[in-house]
């Protein structure tokens, strides 16, 4: 039986994972950590977990990694809003532990990323813009998924990523990301390839959080026998 530690257990993603975990026979939630705990509680939390699924806040990541290293606890990180210093921590931890990071753990969003990469190879001279829409209470903007998609395309086209174009003209060497916030939207991501004569748009819409939670649990199960490295969901789906 795989013992999973759930960090961010009282958040929306944590609650959804708790609702879905019973569908998986070979794992259980063995430990929980949330905003009511002290950071030092991460010690026993990691000790009692084989793999941790983290949907908390960037502020606890360094402590979480330190205790995970102490107890050799594998990490699945889904927390968004991470900054460059956080990714450096993940890369360093992955030299010792298997670590999986993804801004979006649904198969649909990862297929969207794969399709965007393939379309980019063909539509090399098209402009690319990304529009992401989320509920009114989402804190980070642009979304981690939008950044993931933009980075995937930019790596193939050698483009810069622009979050706020302001009043300046669009350059030929950039991908723009625009954000909408409102309602109770779980997540919509649209990638538009704009040519002079036609527009091709790829779109993914999450109808609820189930696909994210199922992806996170699958990631924890998949990671349990992997060697130390930094993985993504595309390693699981082999795309």
Swiss-Prot record:
<comment type="function">
    <text>Catalyzes the conversion of 4-hydroxy-tetrahydrodipicolinate (HTPA) to tetrahydrodipicolinate.</text>
</comment>
<comment type="pathway">
    <text>Amino-acid biosynthesis; L-lysine biosynthesis via DAP pathway; (S)-tetrahydrodipicolinate from L-aspartate: step 4/4.</text>
</comment>
<dbReference type="GO" id="GO:0008839">
    <property type="term" value="F:4-hydroxy-tetrahydrodipicolinate reductase"/>
</dbReference>
<feature type="binding site">
    <location>
        <begin position="144"/>
        <end position="145"/>
    </location>
    <ligand>
        <name>(S)-2,3,4,5-tetrahydrodipicolinate</name>
    </ligand>
</feature>
<dbReference type="GO" id="GO:0050661">
    <property type="term" value="F:NADP binding"/>
</dbReference>
<dbReference type="InterPro" id="IPR000846">
    <property type="entry name" value="DapB_N"/>
</dbReference>
<feature type="active site" description="Proton donor">
    <location>
        <position position="138"/>
    </location>
</feature>
<keyword id="KW-0521">NADP</keyword>
<feature type="binding site">
    <location>
        <begin position="8"/>
        <end position="13"/>
    </location>
    <ligand>
        <name>NAD(+)</name>
    </ligand>
</feature>
<keyword id="KW-0028">Amino-acid biosynthesis</keyword>
<feature type="binding site">
    <location>
        <position position="135"/>
    </location>
    <ligand>
        <name>(S)-2,3,4,5-tetrahydrodipicolinate</name>
    </ligand>
</feature>
<dbReference type="GO" id="GO:0005829">
    <property type="term" value="C:cytosol"/>
</dbReference>
<dbReference type="GO" id="GO:0051287">
    <property type="term" value="F:NAD binding"/>
</dbReference>
<dbReference type="GO" id="GO:0016726">
    <property type="term" value="F:oxidoreductase activity, acting on CH or CH2 groups, NAD or NADP as acceptor"/>
</dbReference>
<dbReference type="InterPro" id="IPR022664">
    <property type="entry name" value="DapB_N_CS"/>
</dbReference>
<dbReference type="InterPro" id="IPR036291">
    <property type="entry name" value="NAD(P)-bd_dom_sf"/>
</dbReference>
<dbReference type="Pfam" id="PF05173">
    <property type="entry name" value="DapB_C"/>
</dbReference>
<protein>
    <recommendedName>
        <fullName>4-hydroxy-tetrahydrodipicolinate reductase</fullName>
        <ecNumber>1.17.1.8</ecNumber>
    </recommendedName>
</protein>
<dbReference type="GO" id="GO:0019877">
    <property type="term" value="P:diaminopimelate biosynthetic process"/>
</dbReference>
<comment type="similarity">
    <text>Belongs to the DapB family.</text>
</comment>
<keyword id="KW-0963">Cytoplasm</keyword>
<dbReference type="InterPro" id="IPR023940">
    <property type="entry name" value="DHDPR_bac"/>
</dbReference>
<feature type="binding site">
    <location>
        <begin position="78"/>
        <end position="80"/>
    </location>
    <ligand>
        <name>NAD(+)</name>
    </ligand>
</feature>
<keyword id="KW-0220">Diaminopimelate biosynthesis</keyword>
<keyword id="KW-0520">NAD</keyword>
<dbReference type="Pfam" id="PF01113">
    <property type="entry name" value="DapB_N"/>
</dbReference>
<keyword id="KW-0560">Oxidoreductase</keyword>
<keyword id="KW-0457">Lysine biosynthesis</keyword>
<dbReference type="GO" id="GO:0009089">
    <property type="term" value="P:lysine biosynthetic process via diaminopimelate"/>
</dbReference>
<feature type="active site" description="Proton donor/acceptor">
    <location>
        <position position="134"/>
    </location>
</feature>
<feature type="binding site">
    <location>
        <begin position="102"/>
        <end position="105"/>
    </location>
    <ligand>
        <name>NAD(+)</name>
    </ligand>
</feature>
<dbReference type="InterPro" id="IPR022663">
    <property type="entry name" value="DapB_C"/>
</dbReference>
């Amino acid at each position: 039986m795989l013992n999973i530690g759930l960090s961010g257990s009282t958040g929306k993603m944590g609650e959804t994972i708790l609702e879905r975990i019973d569908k998986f026979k070979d794992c259980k939630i063995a430990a929980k950590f949330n905003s009511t705990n002290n950071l030092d509680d991460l010690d026993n939390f990691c000790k009692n977990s084989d793999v941790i699924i983290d949907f908390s806040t960037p502020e606890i990541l360094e402590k979480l990694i330190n205790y995970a290293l102490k107890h050799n606890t594998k990490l699945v990180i889904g927390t968004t809003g991470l900054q460059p210093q956080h990714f450096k921590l993940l890369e360093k931890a992955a030299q010792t532990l298997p670590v999986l990071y993804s801004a979006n753990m649904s198969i649909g969003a990862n297929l969207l990323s794969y399709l965007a990469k393939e379309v980019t190879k063909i539509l090399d001279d098209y402009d690319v813009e990304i529009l992401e829409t989320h509920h009114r209470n989402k804190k980070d903007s642009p979304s981690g998924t939008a950044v993931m998609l933009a980075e995937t395309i930019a790596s193939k086209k050698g483009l810069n990523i622009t979050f706020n174009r302001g009043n300046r003209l669009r350059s030929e060497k950039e991908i723009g990301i625009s954000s909408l916030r409102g309602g109770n939207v779980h997540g919509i991501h649209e990638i538009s390839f704009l040519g002079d004569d036609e527009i091709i748009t790829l779109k993914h819409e999450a109808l609820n959080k189930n696909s994210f939670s199922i992806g996170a649990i699958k990631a924890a199960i998949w990671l349990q026998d992997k060697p130390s490295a930094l993985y993504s969901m595309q390693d699981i789906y082999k795309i």
